[in-house]
């Protein structure tokens, strides 16, 4: 469920999904948020997840953050993890334009196909802004695409940790503002069948 008693150590539990091409820094972004260390990581095989507890506006939050593989061969495996997500972060590499273009061409369509929460909060995140001299996607382009896809927008650097916390904190805040997401809960094990699964889509085109 989305809420919990004090015995569990948190008030609200959210499921957040990280998606995007392989190599854009999804795993590094997650590691940077979870801990203070950042490493050069091998591509994720299938799906991994981490749990982070934080306090936002007086509420104790438990974030279960799923890190999905970006390679096409894992696409069918990761599609099931869209189910029940209250927040989805679409990550691209500001130094690789193809990863940006694929957000609309591939990843937004994946959300439309597989997400069961039509009210889920989406965020576009441009990673690797520490490599400014290699930038191939302007901030203005990122903001424009985010507007087109009805997403929040941030740029950050997993390596320097610049604005990493800000991304997750704003996403959590926006989820907290949507009553249907709080009622939905984030547990795919204990949830009731989602009768709305075919009635709404999370991502507008």
Swiss-Prot record:
InterPro entries: P-loop_NTPase (IPR027417), Rab (IPR050227), Sigma_54_int_dom_ATP-bd_1 (IPR025662), Small_GTP-bd (IPR005225), Small_GTPase (IPR001806). Signal peptide: none annotated. It comes from the Eukaryota. GO terms for cellular component: plasma membrane. It is a lipid-anchor. One of its GO terms (molecular function) is GTP binding. Transmembrane segments: none annotated. Its main location: membrane. Disulfide bonds: none annotated. GO terms for biological process: protein transport. Keywords: Cell membrane, GTP-binding, Lipoprotein, Membrane, Nucleotide-binding, Prenylation, Protein transport, Transport. A motif (Effector region) lies at residues 41-49. The keyword Transcription does not apply. A lipid is attached at residues 202-203 (S-geranylgeranyl cysteine). Pfam families: Ras. It is found in: Cell membrane. Belongs to the small GTPase superfamily. Rab family. This is Ras-related protein RABC2b. The lineage of its organism: Eukaryota, Viridiplantae, Streptophyta, Embryophyta, Tracheophyta.
């Amino acid at each position: 469920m989305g809420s919990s008693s004090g015995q569990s150590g948190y008030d609200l539990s959210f499921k957040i999904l990280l998606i995007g091409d392989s190599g854009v820094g999804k795993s590094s972004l997650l590691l940077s948020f979870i801990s203070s260390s950042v490493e050069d990581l091998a591509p994720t095989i299938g799906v991994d997840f981490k749990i982070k507890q934080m306090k936002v506006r007086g509420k104790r939050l438990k974030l279960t953050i799923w890190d999905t593989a970006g390679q096409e061969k894992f696409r069918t495996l990761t599609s099931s993890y869209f189910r029940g997500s209250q927040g989805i972060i679409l990550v691209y590499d500001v130094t690789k334009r193809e990863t940006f273009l694929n957000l609309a061409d591939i990843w937004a369509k994946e959300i439309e196909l597989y997400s069961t929460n039509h009210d889920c909060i989406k965020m576009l995140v441009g990673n690797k802004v520490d490599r400014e001299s290699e930038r191939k996607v302007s901030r203005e382009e990122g903001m424009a695409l985010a507007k087109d896809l009805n997403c929040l927008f941030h740029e950050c650097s997993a390596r320097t940790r610049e604005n990493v916390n800000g991304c997750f904190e704003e996403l959590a805040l926006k989820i907290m503002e949507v009553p249907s997401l709080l009622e939905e809960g984030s547990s795919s094990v204990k949830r009731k069948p989602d009768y709305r699964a075919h009635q709404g889509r999370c991502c507008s085109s």
